[in-house]
Curated annotation (Swiss-Prot):
Gene name of the record: surE
Cofactor: a divalent metal cation
Coiled-coil region list: none
Binding site for a divalent metal cation: D8, D9, S42, N98
The name this protein goes by in its record: 5'-nucleotidase SurE
Lineage, opening ranks: Archaea, Methanobacteriati, Methanobacteriota, Methanomada group, Methanococci
NCBIfam families: PRK00346.2-1 (NF001491), surE (TIGR00087)
Organism, as annotated: Methanocaldococcus jannaschii (strain ATCC 43067 / DSM 2661 / JAL-1 / JCM 10045 / NBRC 100440)
Length: 266
């Protein structure tokens, strides 16, 4: 069995080793390959490097664990992992474990989900796994984050085992694990919430009197009860949202009947 691990937090994210070990414990005969960006790539979505060359370096992450650092995006990591390193589509690709949750329709901006969708696009069973971090100070502390990823990694590996056992009608499983989860934390199947954050723009002035801007926002908690936001943030349960690559409107025939002539007649 071939398993590819990628992320958007970078090759030195502490979650990579924890996930590798959990997968090795669950799938002892698997060949597990880690390919991750050289630098932090959060918020990059499914961007791909088309106009600049990519560098790839082998990196020792632990005593018996090596990975490949790629000077590009998470999507680049998936492509190089499949077509340059493995030379074939792996049985499973796991993107994560992300430092911070990936919820709602805002997953479109996530590098973690971008990599997962890219893997699915090439025919691999694909999982995106993220750990809720409630402290912004910890979320953006990156390599020094004092969080034990062992339990989230074991949860991810257990879900991956079940995912591989069945032919589920989805392209990506988006897993979000609450902070301080245990192996007994309940799991729920959810749908995407509309938003996970409010949107706010902060204007500041540089020493030369020119404006510059930070885009930020505050977490949203009040969403419908069957959404990932509600299940993770209000119920403190693990959320699994099955996703598809095809984002076409669900009721296409109804849309065509109602708006086809309006849109198509010139």
């Amino acid at each position: 069995m071939e398993i590819l691990i990628v992320n958007d937090d970078g090759i030195y994210s502490p979650s990579l080793i924890a996930l590798y070990n959990a997968l090795k414990e669950k799938f002892s005969d698997a060949n597990i390959t880690i390919v991750a960006p050289t630098n932090q790539q959060s918020g990059i979505g499914r961007a791909i490097s088309l106009f600049e060359p990519l560098r790839m370096t082998k990196v020792k992450l632990a005593k018996d664990i090596v990975g490949y650092a790629v000077s590009g995006t998470p999507t680049d990591c998936v492509i190089l992992g499949i077509y340059q390193i493995l030379k074939k589509v792996p049985d499973l690709v796991i993107s994560g474990i992300n430092i911070g949750e990936n919820l709602g329709t805002e997953i479109m901006t996530s590098g973690t989900l971008g990599a997962a969708f890219e893997a699915a696009h090439h025919g691999a069973k694909s999982i995106a796994s993220s750990l809720q971090i409630t402290s912004d100070h910890l979320k953006f502390k990156e390599l020094d984050i004092p969080i034990n990823f062992e339990i989230p990694a074991k949860i991810t590996a257990k879900i991956a085992e079940k995912y591989l056992d069945y032919d589920m009608p989805c392209d990506v499983l988006n897993i979000n694990i609450p902070e301080n989860a245990t192996l007994e934390t309940p799991i729920e199947i959810t749908r995407l919430a509309r938003k996970m954050y409010t949107t706010h723009v902060e204007e500041r002035i540089d020493p030369r009197g020119r404006s510059y801007y930070w885009i930020d926002g505050y977490p949203i908690f009040e969403e419908e009860e069957d959404t990932d936001v509600y299940v993770l943030r209000k119920k403190r349960h693990i959320s699994i949202t099955p996703l598809t690559l095809d984002t076409t409107i669900k009721n296409l025939d109804e849309f065509k009947e109602k708006y086809g002539k309006i849109l198509c007649e010139m």
